[in-house]
Amino acid sequence: MSREGALSDPNAQGGDALDRALRPQTFEDYVGQRKAKANLKVYVEAARGRKEALDHVLLFGPPGLGKTTLAQILAREMGVGFRATSGPVIAKAGDLAAILTNLEPNDVLFIDEIHRLPAIVEEILYPAMEDYALDLVIGEGPAARSVRLDLAPFTLVGATTRAGLLATPLRDRFGIPVRLEFYEPEELGRIVMAAARKLGVPITEDGAVEISARARGTPRIALRLLRRVRDFAEAEGADINRASAARALKRLEIDEDGLDALDRRYLHALVKTYAGGPVGADTLAAALSEARDAVEDVIEPYLMQKGYVARTPRGRVAAPLAYERLGLKAPNGQQSALFGEDED
């Protein structure tokens, strides 16, 4: 999965380590997601008061909204240990069993991309989540027998951008489902200002506003843009203000609405190549030379949230705003094509 320019892979140029250093440590430091944060604080306080493990938590929403950060804060606020892994890494049931048996009482186990767990591993999780127990099969053939191994109470925090891909039995075992939403520009501005202070970067409030307005409602992108704008500002020998930020973002091909070159290629393909749709995700992914997951998880959520694209039972359809963005007039029948249930 790739994005062009400043929205490229988060591991690039050491950004991942820097993002970790800038992460908030407590609920008080965590900006945004007010409803989710308020509810989680109540659940944490109640669990601490009962001296119990927090109920299992499912964090879902578009990438870059702070799911890993929230999981770490939950462990810190509970005063317990934190173990992290990801769905693709746990290939066998034995891998998960080894992790679970090494947890201390009430620890938090964070599984990123939990929708990518193999089915055999999911089945191990069911008794672990419900009964804090592992059902293991020892031996083979007629001599095989089942053994139940007790586990210490723990909290599973699962994170996913594709909650709909979770098996229903697994999804139903999460007592606390939390949907994370895109951030408001004002919230991103506060995040950018706080990060700039930690980095020792001179920045004006209007400079932070310029960056946050183009960050697609996503803190991870806002922090990445801050680093790139800082590079351009330092090369110019200037502080970050509205003018210097706008110049840098223009060079990065990120427009006033936060759309980058890949977004514009998507809209161009949908509107001009496929006449506004409807067109399937696989077809669009092939036209962009991107994986379908990248189209569905990275490109489309923001475009749909901004009103450029709609999903219909027949495929993706360009909204009138997409035509306007490309300087075209929407066909008369295009508006009616937008109505109907979302595509699965």
Curated annotation (Swiss-Prot):
One BP term from GO: DNA recombination
Chain spans, region Small ATPAse domain (RuvB-S): 184-253
GO cellular component terms given for this protein: cytoplasm; Holliday junction resolvase complex
Molecular function (Gene Ontology), one example: ATP hydrolysis activity
Domain of life: Bacteria
Entry EC no(s): 3.6.4.-
Annotated DNA binding sites: R292, R311, R316
Key words, A-Z: ATP-binding, Cytoplasm, DNA damage, DNA recombination, DNA repair, DNA-binding, Hydrolase, Nucleotide-binding
Major location (coarse): cytoplasm
Subcellular location: Cytoplasm
Residues binding Mg(2+): T68
Family stated for the protein in its record: Belongs to the RuvB family.
Subunit: Homohexamer. Forms an RuvA(8)-RuvB(12)-Holliday junction (HJ) complex. HJ DNA is sandwiched between 2 RuvA tetramers; dsDNA enters through RuvA and exits via RuvB. An RuvB hexamer assembles on each DNA strand where it exits the tetramer. Each RuvB hexamer is contacted by two RuvA subunits (via domain III) on 2 adjacent RuvB subunits; this complex drives branch migration. In the full resolvosome a probable DNA-RuvA(4)-RuvB(12)-RuvC(2) complex forms which resolves the HJ.
Protein name: Holliday junction branch migration complex subunit RuvB
This protein's encoding gene: ruvB
